[in-house]
Amino acid sequence: MDAELVVTPPGCAHLGSFKVDNWKQNLRAIYQCFVWSGSAEARKRKAKSCVCHVCGLHLNRLHSCLHCVFFGCFTKKHIHEHAKSKRHNLAIELMYGGIYCFLCQDYIYDKDIEIIAKEEQRKAWKMQGVGEKFSTWEPTKRELELLKHNPKRRKITSNCTIGLRGLINLGNTCFMNCIVQALTHTPLLRDFFLSDRHRCEMQSPSSCLVCEMSSLFQEFYSGHRSPHIPYKLLHLVWTHARHLAGYEQQDAHEFLIAALDVLHRHCKGDDNGKKANNPNHCNCIIDQIFTGGLQSDVTCQVCHGVSTTIDPFWDISLDLPGSSTPFWPLSPGSESSVVNGESHVSGTTTLTDCLRRFTRPEHLGSSAKIKCSGCHSYQESTKQLTMKKLPIVACFHLKRFEHSAKLRRKITTYVSFPLELDMTPFMASSKESRMNGQYQQPTDSLNNDNKYSLFAVVNHQGTLESGHYTSFIRQHKDQWFKCDDAIITKASIADVLDSEGYLLFYHKQFLEYE
């Protein structure tokens, strides 16, 4: 269905309580004094006065109430408590100037406020002697010609299918096609490429995978219906990830990790000059979206000293019941069997079960003693993994392919996965409230920072030796489509949730404003 002309919906309905006498003057004063702070004197005043009125700190995403003089931490919910007790539902974030509505539970957009914010930002930049991060767009001759031939502007409606496009299978390349579908429907990645944010610094842009992905996004969202032929993408993947070269069937999960790695390496120059305190920190779009932090706590069984390490991750690989992993806790009444070289387990396993198994303490045993820094000797220990930092997009890899010296098989155990997922119980901050790895329902229903929504599912049909990959993609909130190479068909939510599941892609429901 083509896009059609529509009237855009109104913004936040709760702004009326703020837009009263002299509201523009008051808002300009807030931006000048507490957000942009163009002069050195204003910056000193901001550093001195902008602290949380509850805890006295200024590092926890400080917000200012728009209805009264109150500064509060967003991370520690001090501004939330103020909003609830005073019924002051609007606040401004003091780092980037976003307006947050506590009734909408999200940052909101208002054209009038945006104009004031941009004007005050430009004034501050001028006082500081700096320019805008991105220059004003000037259309090329080719773009001017295109604009002449396309004078009407189209807006995407809830029934629009722009962005859905089939991909030609170039010879056992379904593993690549399903991952491309998931990446091109990742909201923040789509916004990055469609806003022309990539700045290629490679000597040969034709060998840059990020440039090719940018072209791919343009193809997907051009409105064309015919299947796209991703021959150049395949060539670049073969060039930069030699282990994937050739026309034999490959693992979709392996392709995902290889593609993210190449994109990460080719994104040099896209961080817009941002510098982190950690020189090893990368701020490219791939790391911003997909990188999380996995905390590993090793506890000595003698002195109970804890050694903690934090490692980055792009995906979370989860064991399944029916694998050769000896410590999988089968639920009462479950039975396992092997049929035609494939492992099956009766009963229903959930994604939460797999995450509970992933984050429970594991006794390392006497054969894996570590040298304890407290005891200064080798001792038995336990190891527990938790999430220190969650990525914007969480990819869960269900380990269905088992390779060992004795056997090679596919595990077809059905795993039930939800449309919405709360990762709070598996956070490092929730570890103390979880006894011996037992799952506990989070008590803070207002904590939305760790909540995710499903937007893509990759499935594998067939056996380990011969199979085929397809994917389900969420186009709008409740519209799903099945992508089978060049064929795109509409799917129901039941179709998605009843599928076997190999790779599950979840997107954060609420994002920090930046």
Swiss-Prot record:
Pfam families: UCH, zf-UBP
InterPro entries the record matches: Papain-like_cys_pep_sf, Peptidase_C19_UCH, Ub_carboxyl-term_hydrolase, USP_CS, USP_dom, Znf_RING/FYVE/PHD, Znf_UBP
N6-acetyllysine modification, residue list: K118
Domain USP: 165-509
Keywords: Acetylation, Activator, Cell cycle, Chromatin regulator, Cytoplasm, Hydrolase, Metal-binding, Nucleus, Phosphoprotein, Protease, Thiol protease, Transcription, Transcription regulation, Ubl conjugation, Ubl conjugation pathway, Zinc, Zinc-finger
Modified residue annotations for Phosphothreonine: T136
Active-site residue list: C174 (nucleophile), H468 (proton acceptor)
Gene3D superfamilies, A to Z: Cysteine proteinases, Zinc/RING finger domain, C3HC4 (zinc finger)
Enzyme Commission number(s): 3.4.19.12
Highest taxon, organism lineage: Eukaryota
Reaction(s) this enzyme catalyzes, per UniProt: Thiol-dependent hydrolysis of ester, thioester, amide, peptide and isopeptide bonds formed by the C-terminal Gly of ubiquitin (a 76-residue protein attached to proteins as an intracellular targeting signal)
Zinc fingers typed UBP-type, residue spans: 10-127
Main localisation: nucleus
Residues bound to Zn(2+) 1: C12, H14, C101, C104
A GO molecular function held by the record: zinc ion binding
PTM annotation: Phosphorylated in G2/M phase, but not in G1 phase by CDK1. Ubiquitinated and subsequently degraded in a CDC20-dependent manner.
GO CC term (a single one): nucleus
Positions of post-translational Phosphoserine modification: S226
BP GO terms, sorted: chromatin organization; protein deubiquitination; proteolysis
Binding site for Zn(2+) 2: C52, C55, C73, H78
Annotated localization: Nucleus; Cytoplasm
Residue ranges of the TM segments: none
Family: Belongs to the peptidase C19 family. UBP8 subfamily.
Described purpose of this protein according to its UniProt entry: Deubiquitinase that plays a role in several cellular processes including transcriptional regulation, cell cycle progression or innate immunity. As part of the transcription regulatory histone acetylation (HAT) complex SAGA, catalyzes the deubiquitination of both histones H2A and H2B, thereby acting as a transcriptional coactivator. Recruited to specific gene promoters by activators such as MYC, where it is required for transcription. Facilitates cell-cycle progression by stabilizing CCNB1 and antagonizing its proteasome-mediated degradation in a cell cycle-specific manner.
PANTHER family: UBIQUITIN CARBOXYL-TERMINAL HYDROLASE, UBIQUITIN CARBOXYL-TERMINAL HYDROLASE 22
Name of the protein: Ubiquitin carboxyl-terminal hydrolase 22
